[in-house]
Curated annotation (Swiss-Prot):
The chain crosses the membrane at residues 3-23. GO terms for biological process: cytochrome complex assembly; photosynthesis. The gene is petN. This is Cytochrome b6-f complex subunit 8. It holds the Pfam family PetN. GO terms for molecular function: electron transporter, transferring electrons within cytochrome b6/f complex of photosystem II activity. Signal peptide: none annotated.
Amino acid sequence: MDIVSIGWAALMVVFTFSLSLVVWGRSGL
């Protein structure tokens, strides 16, 4: 596994986490 795949994996994790955080915030959960 090279640094590019690690970077992409980390980016996807952060993006998914922030997206679900926004959805939860708008639902008022």
